[in-house]
From Swiss-Prot:
The organism's place on the tree of life at top rank: Eukaryota
Catalytic function, reaction form: K(+)(in) = K(+)(out); Na(+)(in) = Na(+)(out)
Protein source organism: Xenopus laevis
Keyword entries, A-Z: Cell membrane, Disulfide bond, Glycoprotein, Ion channel, Ion transport, Ligand-gated ion channel, Membrane, Postsynaptic cell membrane, Receptor, Signal, Synapse, Transmembrane, Transmembrane helix, Transport
Distribution of this protein across tissues and organs: Oocytes.
Phylogenetic classification of the source organism: Eukaryota, Metazoa, Chordata, Craniata, Vertebrata
Family, similarity comment: Belongs to the ligand-gated ion channel (TC 1.A.9) family. Acetylcholine receptor (TC 1.A.9.1) subfamily. Alpha-1/CHRNA1 sub-subfamily.
Record bears the keyword Flavoprotein: no
Gene that this polypeptide is encoded by: chrna1-a
The protein, known as: Acetylcholine receptor subunit alpha-1-A
């Protein structure tokens, strides 16, 4: 019994499907019996076809800053009424909607005007949804490659204003009128990008009058997208490493000159920076229209490192100076031995002796005026008989020579210590200066743009 009932139900469903298929087939044949897809679907020639256009943005595939091309995945929704494709559902088994190939009917030749790859038209031949009232809905998918003028001045904290200009290719405003479905594109199915944030998006309709036909308007719908770059990737992989290189450069001046590794460290930092720049150069837009912020910062870091090498050479040269080759001017002593240490609060550092008491070789009871042939400032009229002895005179002359030699060595050592002290003061001064310049330079390059973006919300 159940088997018989099942067979009856299946036969009934099969008959219904066959009957419905016959109704749909008959409907399609009747609709296209005398249909001409080249002619606009209007009753009179002066009538206009009103096309409603809506853009559904699915995905932002790629933003090519070098070639200034934005690749997007979209669905272009188009609605219009075809007066030749209407029917009464009662005559065709209650069928109210059918799906037919878009290539079999008239359709507006809407193209992307600012296309960047030459494929202006929509190439996907998808089906349209046809209502018994003649209303047609066509929602073809498309990959748009649109031209967008890239302003990379503030890269990687940049905003890009890109657009898609849509309009009919052959019909002017007296034949086909295009209206936007909404004042904004549809982003309900938009897949967020890992590099860009859709900050704002708008839609405008334009009436354009060309020189060839100043009385005939041509209509277009332009969708504008304000794209803000997400800079985290570039901050982590470019900005922070460059900042660390700058701080490492400053630490060169904290390394003692006697270690002999100051130049080695400076050159190592420079070579590391060059290798790093060669690796990340592909991440930066290669355009000559403007120097991006990150390019300025990389240039600043390079100059910073090279300047540290040059100054380090000067410091090392100062450290190894001697009185036989260089005599320290008094103004240099005044600045680097007296003034700067006191101003920079390292007066506790051991300074070279400024005033030393001269050692007296001879006592008041001894006069060597007879040796030099002149009376000394402390000479007395009485001379001991011992001084008349030639051996004593020779011993006194030897002692005088030794004293003068010791005095010369002490002055030479003192001068060398003064040069070393000046080099040490330079190191401490340059350490502070380089750290301050590193911080101020970084803020000067990036802070203004970051504050501007914060003010814009």
């Amino acid at each position: 019994m159940d088997f018989v009932l099942t067979r009856l139900i299946l036969l009934f469903l099969a008959a219904t499907i066959i009957y419905s298929s016959e109704d749909e087939s008959r409907l399609i044949n009747d609709l296209f019996k005398s249909y001409n897809k080249v002619v606009r679907p209007v009753k009179a020639f002066k009538d206009k076809v009103v096309v409603t256009v809506g853009l559904q943005l699915i995905q932002l595939i790629n933003v090519n800053e070098v070639n200034q091309i934005v690749t997007t995945n979209v669905r272009l929704k188009q609605q219009w009424e075809d007066v030749h494709l209407k029917w009464d559902p009662e005559d065709y088994g209650g069928i109210k909607k059918v799906r037919i190939p878009s290539s079999d009917i008239w359709r507006p030749d809407i193209v992307l005007y600012n296309n960047a790859d030459g494929d202006f038209a929509i190439v996907q031949e998808t089906k349209v949804l046809l209502d018994y009232t003649g209303k047609i809905i066509w929602l073809p998918p498309a990959i748009f490659k649109s031209y967008c003028e890239m302003i990379v001045t503030y890269f990687p904290f940049d905003l890009q204003n890109c657009s898609m200009k849509l309009g009919t290719w052959t019909y002017d405003g007296t034949l086909v009128v295009i209206n936007p479905e909404n004042d904004r594109p549809d982003l309900s199915n938009f897949m967020e990008s890992g590099e860009w944030y859709m900050k704002d998006y708008r839609c405008w309709k334009h009436w354009v009058y060309y020189d060839c036909c100043p009385e005939t308007p041509y209509l277009d719908i332009t969708y504008h997208f304000l794209l803000q770059r997400l800079p985290l990737y570039f901050i982590v992989n470019v900005v922070i490493p460059c900042l660390l290189f700058s701080f490492l450069t400053g630490l060169v001046f904290y390394l003692p000159t006697d270690s002999g590794e100051k130049i080695t460290l400076s050159v190592s930092v420079l070579l590391s920076l060059v290798v790093f720049l060669l690796v990340i150069v592909e991440l930066i837009p290669s355009t000559s229209s403007a120097v991006p912020l990150i390019g300025k910062y990389m240039l600043f870091t390079m100059v910073f490192v090279i300047a540290s090498i040059v100054i380090t050479v000067i410091v090392i040269n100062t450290h190894h100076r001697s009185p036989s080759t260089h005599i320290m001017p008094q103004w240099l002593k005044k600045i680097f031995i007296e003034t700067i240490p006191r101003v920079m609060f390292f007066s506790t550092m051991k300074r070279p002796a400024q005033d030393q008491h001269k050692k007296k070789i001879f006592t008041e009871d001894i006069d060597i005026s007879d040796i030099s042939g002149k009376l000394g400032p402390t000479a007395v009229k009485y001379q001991s008989p011992i001084l008349k002895n030639p051996d004593v005179k020779s011993a006194i002359e030897g002692a005088k020579y030794v004293a003068e030699t010791m005095k010369s060595d002490q002055e030479s050592t003192k001068a060398s210590e003064e040069w070393k002290f000046v080099a040490m003061v330079l190191d401490h001064l340059l350490l502070a200066v380089f750290m301050i310049v590193c911080i101020i330079g970084t803020l000067a390059i990036f802070a203004g743009r970051l504050i501007e973006l914060h003010m814009q919300g």
